[in-house]
């Protein structure tokens, strides 16, 4: 059996070094790139899965509708007879340092709203509450933090990741 996953890695080159969008998983306290499972209808079009997960895991703050990307995939064994196929999408975004700061501020505002709803026992979007921090940082900064081993092994230590970041052979996407 195969399960399908997507990893969304927005990267911006505005500034001296590329900065990557990272989030911290609320449960495990690992810093990761946005990662999630694909719904059945998304399996044929995993970029939709990556974009949905990106929006959910950034609390609705980052919602990309069109742009450029490059991608690669890898497969890991979850258990005997179960493979996880990961589609990794590098999304090229043009966020200035000021915009990056503003997006992180909005993420934190949304987190406060969610926490207030929890206290008041009001309904809230559970899918928006998977990560407790969001950041734009260089890979050097990202590598100083507690990271999920699967991201390190299959993305950060994968030459395809660096080929995708530097590739000028980009694809375009546009969704409604």
Give each language-model segment a name:
Residues 17-63:
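Conserved Nudix-box catalytic region and its N-terminal flanking loop in Nudix hydrolases
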Residues 27-31, 98-176:
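Nudix hydrolase/Nudix homology domain
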């Amino acid at each position: 059996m195969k399960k399908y996953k997507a990893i969304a890695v927005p990267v911006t080159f505005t500034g001296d070094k590329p900065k990557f969008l990272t989030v911290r998983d609320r449960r495990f306290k690992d810093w990761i790139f946005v990662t999630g499972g694909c719904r059945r209808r998304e399996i044929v079009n995993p970029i939709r899965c990556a974009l949905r997960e990106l929006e959910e895991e950034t609390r609705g703050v980052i919602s990309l509708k069109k742009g450029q990307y490059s991608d690669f995939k890898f497969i890991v064994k979850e258990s005997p007879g179960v493979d996880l196929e990961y589609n990794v999408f590098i999304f090229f975004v043009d966020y200035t340092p000021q915009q990056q700061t503003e997006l992180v501020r909005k993420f934190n505002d949304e987190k406060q709203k969610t926490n207030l709803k929890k206290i008041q026992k009001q309904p809230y979007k559970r899918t928006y509450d998977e990560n407790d921090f969001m950041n734009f940082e260089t890979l050097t900064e990202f590598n100083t933090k507690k990271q999920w081993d699967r991201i390190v092994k299959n993305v950060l230590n994968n030459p395809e990741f660096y080929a995708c970041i530097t590739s000028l052979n980009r694809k375009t996407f546009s969704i409604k």
